[in-house]
A protein has these predicted regions:
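Membrane-interface helix-loop junctions in multi-pass transporters/channels
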Residues: 1-123
């Protein structure tokens, strides 16, 4: 059953990521990997909320964990795309954008997880 839940969550997470990437490219352009940045930061925030809620309710080994954490958020966020897009920025000579993507993703991602945990503990 857990594989089905992970697969279903992954299907939904991958489609949500595709929608975010498409939306970001349409609204913000493609000179910076905005979509991946937004997906990774919002995914970090959602992960923080989910971990706090699941931990506080002793549900870390529950079916919801497989669906949400391994499935949905595992497919929604994407480290491999982040690293590839960062490499492309550096190769294109956009060093400032490359550094902004790497440092911003890590720093803001950590902040997003922290804020998500704080918010999740309110529930």
């Amino acid at each position: 059953m857990q594989y089905l839940l992970i697969g279903l969550g992954g299907f939904l997470g991958a489609n949500a990521r595709f929608l975010v990437l498409s939306w970001a490219a349409r609204l913000l352009g493609t000179n910076f990997p905005y979509g991946t940045f937004i997906a990774n930061i919002s995914g970090s925030f959602l992960l923080g909320i989910a971990i706090a809620i699941l931990h506080d309710r002793a549900l870390l080994e529950s079916p919801q964990r497989y669906f949400l954490l391994a499935g949905f958020l595992g497919a929604y966020t994407t480290f491999s795309t982040f690293t590839y897009e960062s490499m492309q920025l550096f190769q294109q000579g956009a060093v400032l954008f490359g550094l902004l993507n790497v440092l911003g993703s890590v720093a803001i991602g950590l902040l997003a997880v922290f804020c998500g945990v704080l918010l999740g503990r309110l529930f």
